[in-house]
Amino acid sequence: MNDYIVVKCGGSMLDQLNDVFFDCIKKLQQQYKVVIVHGGGPEIDAKLKDCNINVEKRDGLRVTPKEVMDVVQMVLCGSTNKKLVMNLQKHNLLAVGCSGCDGNLLQVQPVSGEIGYVGEVSYVETALLKGLINMNYIPVIAPVGINDNEIYNINADTAAAGIAAALSAKELIFITDVDGVLHEGKLVKKTDESEIATFIEKGVITGGMIPKVQAALASLKMGVQKISIVNGTKDFTEVTGECIGTTVTKGVSIV
């Protein structure tokens, strides 16, 4: 049980997680060292609306001036993180919630002054994660990071990819509400970078699946060897520990 697995669960999925999801995490934990990274977009948007603060995104990244960062921090590091931790523990999975600024876990470089406090992962303090895992806890990470004693928002997909790359994880699993990439109604079990580009060009991959596969491609570029896109509302783990869904790698695929 030396391999790490990073599980990324988007904010829109958190309310859809059922007993099956937590059973899958238990199965993964029997064979791997598990880290969970979560998003929180819908809850952040709702809180910003309550505060009469505009929601603005550019190229998929949330524009994050100081007033927005305060709300992002409150939601991600507070209610969203703790709800997921409590849900895991309700299913007898010991978890510790922490944010990327705790123990300097996620250090970032600012993306651009134009979009405010948004950062890209530049360094991961893996000793903190390994310490928690060695004490049999699942680290549950809120994707904010630190630079020069300021807190920055991090896209949850790239935060998960950065953590997976730093841990040399066996796999990064994206939890979604679909079975994976479909081609002519059938699940594409294995694919690679070039095939995904072809699928997008030919319209095989459309709509909400496009950002998911783009996140997978970005993860490959960051050094992650294997990414799986799975349906978190169904059993997505084989007895062998392999994922049921679409697996994306750099190499040539056999579909």
UniProtKB/Swiss-Prot annotation:
Q: In which pathway does it act?
A: Amino-acid biosynthesis; L-arginine biosynthesis; N(2)-acetyl-L-ornithine from L-glutamate: step 2/4
Enzyme class label: transferase
A biological process term (GO) from this entry: L-arginine biosynthetic process
Catalysed reactions, semicolon-separated: N-acetyl-L-glutamate + ATP = N-acetyl-L-glutamyl 5-phosphate + ADP
Which family does the record claim for this protein?
Belongs to the acetylglutamate kinase family. ArgB subfamily.
Q: HAMAP family recorded for this chain?
A: ArgB
Name of this chain's protein: Acetylglutamate kinase
